[in-house]
Amino acid sequence: MKKQSSLRGRVTVFLPLFFALVLILPGLENGSYARWMLALSFPCVLLLLLLLPSRLFFLDRPSFSAVAVLCGFGMMAGVYLSEDAALSLALSYALLLLFLFAGAVSARSFRASPFSAVFPAALGLFLLSGPFWTGVSFSLAEGGIALLLFSVSAFLSRRNYVPALGVTLAGLLLLLLGKDIPSALLWGIAAVLLFWAGSGSGLWSLLSLVTVCALFAGAMLLFPSSEPSPSVPSLPSPASMPLLAPEVPQSSPSSGSDPLWLLLGRQYGSVFLLLSLLLMLVLLIRGASLALNARSAFHGILGLGVVLFFGGRTLLFLLSLSGLLPLASPEPPLILSSLPSLAAHGFLAGLLSGISARNEADLAEDARLSMLAR
C-alpha cells in the first residue's frame, strides 16, 4: 500500500510538470499570450483532478491517467495550431472531461434494465442517422456507436438476444447507408465479439457473424462504387513526418486542417507518435482487467465493448497508416480535434471509471455482508 501511494504521488507530480514544460515553451517561442495561457491551463486542470479524491468523480486512477496523457499529447500538437484552432481544441478537451464524468456516473449508477437498454438504443440510432439530416456537416457516428455499445451490453446481460441483434443490425445498416465504411467495420467486429463473449451460445455468435457479413456483402453489391462519407477524413502520407524530432521544430502555426497526430509526428517525430499510441495498451489492459473482475454481466460486457472500441479504432488507424487497409480510417483515439468524437471517447473512457467504482462498491457490500454473517 505504501509503495502504491508513493507511485501515485510521483505520477501526480510528474505528469503536470512534464506537460507544463512541453506546452508552455512553444507558446513562449511563438510569442502568443493566448496560446501560452491555454498551454498553462491543461497542467493546472490535470493537477487538480489528480489531487482530488478519486471517489468524488468515480475516477479510476490508471485509466484516467492514460486518458489524460493521450489528451496531453493532443494538446502538445494543438500548441502549433492557430490561436482560434487552439482555443477550439482546448474547449473540446474540456467537454471531453464533462462526458468522462457523465460516463463514470452512468456506469456506476445504471444496471441492466429495460430503460438502460431501450433509451440508449433509440438515441444511438438517432445519432447514426445524422448523414441523412440536412445541414449536418460533421459525423455523429462514434457517439451513436458508444450508446449502442451501452444498449447491446444491457440486452446481452439480460439474455435478450433478439433485441440485441436487432439493434446491432439497425446500427450497422445506418452506417453502411451513410457510407461510413470504417465505422461500420469497427461496429460490426465489436458487435460480433460482444455476442461471442456475452451470449455464451455458439448459435447466437454464429448468427450474428452471418448476419453482419451478409449486410456487408449486400452493401458492397448495392453500392459497388460508393466512396466513404466526406465526414471520414482520409489519412495523409506519413512520409512528411521525420523519424525523430527535428533539430529545429516548426514554429509556424498550422491552420487546423492537418490532423493532430500528423502535427505531433512532424514536431516530435514518428517514433514519438508510435510510442504515444503504446499508451493505449495501458488503457486496454486496464479495461480488460475491470471487465474480467466485474461482478455483474452487464458491467463485464460493457467493459469489453469499450476495450474493443478503442483497440479496434487504434488497429484500424495503424493498418491504414501502413497501407495494409485500403480505407480512409479514423484518427487515433483521443489525439484528434473532432468535438463529437472527443465527446464519445470521453464517455467511453468514463465508463471504465464507472465500472471500477461499481466493482469497488460491490466488494465493499460483500465485505459488509460477510461481517454481518459472522
Predicted features by range, described:
Residues 1-5, 20-26, 317-374:
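A juxtamembrane structural motif centered on a specific transmembrane helix
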Residues 2-7, 21-40, 55-66, 73-95, ...:
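Interfacial transmembrane-helix termini
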Residues 22, 39-52, 69-77, 92-106, ...:
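Central hydrophobic cores of alpha-helical transmembrane segments in multi-pass inner-membrane proteins
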Residues 41-45, 91-98, 265-287:
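Hydrophobic alpha-helical transmembrane segments
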Residues 59-67, 84-92, 102-126, 161-166, ...:
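Interfacial loop-to-transmembrane-helix boundary motif in multi-pass membrane proteins
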Residues 155-222:
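Hydrophobic alpha-helical segments of polytopic membrane proteins
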Residues 291-329, 335:
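Loop-to-helix entry and N-terminal half of a specific, functionally important transmembrane alpha helix
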